[in-house]
Amino acid sequence: MYKRQVFGYRTTDVDKNGCDVREDVLARDLKQVRFKYSGSCKVASGLLHDPYTGLNINFVRGRKTSALVQIDHVVALENAWQSGAWKWSHAKRLKFGNDMLNLLAVQGAANQEKGSASAAYWLPSNKSFRCDYVARQIAVKYKYDLSVTNAEKRSMASILHGCSAQKLPNS
């Protein structure tokens, strides 16, 4: 039975820099990043060019504003579970749940719309990002030896057909 917490997301400092993975992703994906205070891991504000929608979003940490920018698992945790993660060790699930290759800062509404959907059922509305998105899904599924349904394969092939010399990301 799928349980999100078995992937350990957000409680882990994978790169041992003292910051949880959410802060690492925000610091990587936002521009004009400002931290709460000097030497802090906590991102106070920044500008996200959302890859899923193409919109620019001003991120400001706060109870009413932080959800505007969320961290998405490109291959959703539930999709990974259904694709083979159910048989992994605890350590491998932690690694997957916190793998920077599989994490992107995105518009909260787009992340909620996507939910646990695979590329067969959801693609970014920003068509110029679809090649990168599908390539990243393939890279993650390949890295972790996750299965791909026939519907996913058709959707991925359809998108990649229009991508000239698309390469798989490795980080």
Regions found by a protein language model. Name each.
Residues Y37-G46:
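A charge-rich, low-complexity, intrinsically flexible signal that marks solvent-exposed coils, linkers
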Residues M1-Y2:
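Short, small-residue-biased leader/transition segments that mark boundaries at the very start
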Residues V43, Y52-S171:
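Domain-level detector of nuclease and nuclease-like folds
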Residues V6-Y9:
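Short acidic, Pro/Gly- and aromatic-enriched capping/linker segments at domain boundaries
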Residues V25-A27:
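Beta-strand-rich, non-transmembrane domain signature
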Residues K16-G18:
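Acidic, glycine-anchored loop motifs typical of Ca2+
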